[in-house]
């Protein structure tokens, strides 16, 4: 089985959900004819306007889910819908939704690791469940930005069988080298595909790196964006993950008696 995955890399308008939704719809309209799965960046409706999240957050995720269901069904495409700020009671979570091409929400994942350097912990609550899901029978996982710095968290998903890691981010330009190195390492050590969608542009506090990446289980970069807005697309052969795991049986050699 093969998938074409497209990362929709764009400049997120700071604190302006209506503008960002229009931009996402433009890219989805443009790319849905060419891909099986579309991936959006982190906090793509609001950007990191953390100080105003109390006002901007989507109550129970109702607006985001309604939009996502209609959009995925209209275009007949699976969407890993980046993440949005969702209010649940008194908490706000950095939340990823995944919709299948029939317009059904099949997974909700809340970012588990909050990045204190950008004050996330002051405005957001951390999730406590993993991002594992199956899409068209393909074992997959969704993760958000800072999560990729925690290999133990990634391994939890791949030991459940995930062959594709979908990652949404707002990764800053000064740490672009970390972004690339971490993603390639996660692909190699877990023998899986990685599709990582970053944003570009800037906000009042940060300049973002772009360079969305699609990586195969050997750690080879299949597609990479630049600093500008655009589509990062690659076709992947999903059988390759199983073949790599068979050729170098890392998972069979894990020393559970030691770690």
From Swiss-Prot:
Gene assigned in the entry: mtnU
Knocked-out gene: effects: Impaired growth on methylthioribose (MTR) as sole sulfur source.
EC main group: hydrolase
Protein family: Belongs to the carbon-nitrogen hydrolase superfamily. NIT1/NIT2 family.
Keywords: Hydrolase
SUPFAM superfamilies listed in its UniProt record: Carbon-nitrogen hydrolase (SSF56317)
Function summary: Involved in the methylthioribose (MTR) recycling pathway. Probably catalyzes the conversion of 2-oxoglutaramate to 2-oxoglutarate.
Domain of life: Bacteria
Reactions mediated catalytically: 2-oxoglutaramate + H2O = 2-oxoglutarate + NH4(+)
Known EC number: 3.5.1.111
CN hydrolase domain mapped to chain residues: 3-238
Source organism per UniProt: Bacillus subtilis (strain 168)
Keyword DNA repair in annotation: no
PANTHER family xrefs: DEAMINATED GLUTATHIONE AMIDASE (PTHR23088:SF27), NITRILASE-RELATED (PTHR23088)
CDD domains assigned to the protein according to its UniProt record, in alphabetical order: nitrilase_5
Catalytic residues (positions): 42, 111, 145
Keyword Protein biosynthesis: no
Protein name: 2-oxoglutaramate amidase
Gene Ontology MF terms in the entry: 2-oxoglutaramate amidase activity
Gene3D superfamilies in the record: Carbon-nitrogen hydrolase
């Amino acid at each position: 089985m093969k998938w074409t995955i497209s990362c929709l890399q764009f400049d997120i308008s700071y604190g302006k959900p209506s503008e960002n939704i229009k931009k996402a719809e433009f890219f989805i309209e443009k790319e849905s004819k060419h891909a099986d799965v579309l991936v959006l960046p982190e906090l793509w409706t609001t950007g990191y306007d953390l100080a105003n999240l109390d006002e901007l957050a989507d109550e129970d995720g109702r607006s985001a889910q309604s939009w996502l269901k209609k959009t995925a069904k209209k275009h007949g495409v699976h969407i890993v819908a980046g993440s949005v700020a969702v209010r649940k009671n008194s908490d706000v979570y950095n939340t990823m939704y995944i919709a299948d091409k029939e317009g059904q929400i099949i997974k909700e994942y809340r970012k588990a690791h909050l990045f204190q350097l950008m004050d996330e912990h002051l405005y957001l609550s951390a999730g406590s469940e993993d991002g594992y899901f199956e899409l068209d029978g393909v074992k997959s996982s969704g993760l958000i930005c800072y999560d990729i710095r925690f290999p133990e968290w990634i391994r939890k998903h791949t030991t459940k069988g995930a062959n594709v890691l979908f990652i949404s981010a707002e990764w800053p330009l000064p740490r672009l080298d970390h972004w690339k190195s971490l993603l390639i390492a996660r692909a190699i050590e877990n023998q899986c595909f990685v599709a990582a969608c970053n944003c570009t542009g800037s906000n009042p506090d940060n300049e973002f790196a772009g360079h969305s990446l699609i990586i195969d289980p050997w750690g080879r970069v299949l597609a990479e964006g630049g600093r500008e807005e655009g589509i990062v697309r690659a076709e992947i052969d999903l059988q390759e993950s199983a073949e790599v795991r068979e050729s170098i049986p890392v998972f069979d050699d894990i020393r559970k008696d030691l770690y």
